[in-house]
Regions:
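Preference for long, solvent-exposed alpha-helical segments and helix-linker "stalks"
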Residues: 1-177
Length: 177
């Protein structure tokens, strides 16, 4: 009988090994990274596509700074934010927006409209947790980071915001959200 926490332990061990190998500039770092991803593949194969495991994989992609897989981490986070936002932590909010979201925007893989939509969804998660008294300081801090990072993008220009929100308003003038 397989136990899912064996996979959690395995990913933790290999994540640490990847970090050590990268620090030592070892030639075999990719082998360890591939093994980390293989553990996730087996985890999904044996226990299904659980949202918590998707978030864990996304977080580990960022933790090992595997930028070629940032689009995958972005897609995993996006799916979980849409389907089960209650499990998203303050760290997840930061990783999704600051690392993968900024990467996707800078590389032209997403447009400002999607970036701003992500900002709104993640801000709502922060606000919800703050209102419920859950890790208020952490969510306040990450909201400040979101605001700062948004301001560093071309998406925060008055012209761009007016263009996006005018179109939304014109499509549905009764909905002011």
């Amino acid at each position: 009988q397989l136990k899912s926490n064996l996979y959690a332990n395995g990913t933790y061990i290999y994540k640490q090994l990847v970090k050590e190998k990268k620090k030592a500039k070892a030639a075999d770092v990719n082998l360890y990274r591939d093994t980390l991803y293989n553990i996730y593949d087996k985890w999904f194969e044996n226990f299904g596509q659980c949202n918590k495991t998707k978030v864990s994989l996304a977080k580990d992609i960022i933790y090992v700074n595997d930028q070629k897989n940032f689009p995958k981490a972005y897609a995993l986070y996006k799916e979980v934010v849409e389907n089960e936002p209650a499990i998203i932590t303050s760290t997840d909010v930061k990783y999704y927006f600051v690392y993968t979201g900024m990467y996707m925007l800078k590389t032209g893989k997403i447009e400002c409209e999607e970036f701003l939509s992500n900002y709104e969804a993640l801000s709502a998660i922060c606000e919800n947790n703050i209102a419920q008294g859950k890790k208020v300081e952490k969510f306040n801090n990450v909201q400040n980071i979101l605001d700062k990072k948004l301001g560093e993008t071309p998406c925060a220009s008055c012209d761009k915001l007016e263009e996006i929100y005018s179109a939304k308003y014109n499509n549905d003038p009764e909905n002011m959200d």
